[in-house]
Structure formats: structure tokens, C-alpha cells
Amino acid sequence: RYVMPILHDVTVGLPPINEPNMVALTRGGTEGSDFVAASLPAPDPDISATLVKAHRKAREILSGNPRIKSGWTIACQAFHAMPGCEREMEEYQYPREDYFTEAAAGDDFIGVQAYLRTFIGKDGPVPIPEDAERTLTGWEYFPPALGIAIRHTWNVAKRTPIIVTENGIATADDRRRIDYTFDAIAGMRDAMDDGIDVRGYLHWSLLDNYEWGSFAPTFGLASLGQGHLRTSSEAIPGLAGVNCENGGHVQIEDR
């Protein structure tokens, strides 16, 4: 209600709450540098329910301006079940992700924020293999996570339109940043070709920034050096082959 008077010219999507599942998992705040959400305990059901109520109330208020489109943004993981552990995966995934995705059904859009996959076994998350390629956050390098998350969200949110509100990689190697982003967007394009309504893609992020207590995980398409001087990276010209045309068609040329 307080900010509505300054939103009269807004015509883009607004998320009243960013990553409510992460808010619930951390109970509103936590310390430390553990970048892997799968390592966190299940959220308190009361906190999760309160977040859903707050989201719906915020959307009710925002709907007073018909130009504003609203929906919240979910931290998604491409969950995989180890053989015979499908039930355990569903029980693990539901309170951490699907509960919040279900609550978005019928919204103007739902934001998908995807970077990685997590395997679930009988006792919960399975450690990443020692020989797997990792990013600077310690996550497995897995570009297909975006396409998997888009497809899963489309089904759970009952065909609510999707905006990719975060996707990217923390790396010091711009060649791998280009590879990751090309392959992630290719998965998004395949989902769109299959009829999934994806209305936009936002990369995380343009510039390196302060992530989880450190400047170390460099997500930026452009880097920041000493003295906060902006330095061009190879990633920006390297991604010039990704073209998003009017009508939602995504064309990917040779990288």
C-alpha cells in the first residue's frame, strides 16, 4: 500500500517476495557461507504458510493497478532421484520447493531461478562426486538445470506463465560462462518449443557483486577490479549469438 503511489507507471512484472522458499529454509536469516540450499533443514510449515498468505495479500493490493503483473520467484533445483528413491525425492522436494510453486498457480507469472541439480537418496541429498566439475559456489556445473526447472515448474504451477528471473554461473573462466549460458538457454528454448509459456530471461548477473558474504563467487558478465573499475569480459561478446526475437522465438547461433 505504501509503494503503490509510485508504481503507477510500472508495466513489468513485480515479485512481492523473492525466493520465499529460501526465506523459509533460513527462517528469515542465517549466517555462514554454505551456498547449497539442499543442505538446509526443512522449513517451518508455519513460516511457509505465512509467506503464502503475505504473497497473496500483496498480489491483491498490486492488482489495484491493472498495468502491474505480479508473481513470486522460486529458487529451483533440478532434483533427481537415486534408483528406488522417487518417494524420498518427492517428500524432500515438496516442502522446499513445490509447496511454494503450487501457491503460484494462477498468478500473472512465476519466476524460475535455477542453477544446479541435487540427487536425493534414502537419507536425503547425495554428495556431489569428487570428479564432477564445480563452480565457484561449490555447485555442480550442470546447465540443463534450467530446462528441467522450467518443465517441472510448468507442471506444478498448472501452466502459469514463466519468467526466468535468475540463471548464471559463478566462475573465473569466461569460456565456461559462455558454454553454461548457451546450454542453459538451449534447454529453455527446447521447453518453449514444446509449448511452455516462457516470457523472458534475466541473467544473473551483469556485474560481479557481493554474494553470501563475499565477492569471491563471480557471477558477472562483466568483472569488477580493484577500485571498483569495470572490466569487460569475454562473456558479453561471446553471448552475442543468442537472439530473442519478437513473439518469443529464441535463436541460438554458433558460440
Feature-to-residue mapping (PLM):
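Non-catalytic scaffold segments within catalytic domains of secreted glycoside hydrolases
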Residues: 1-255
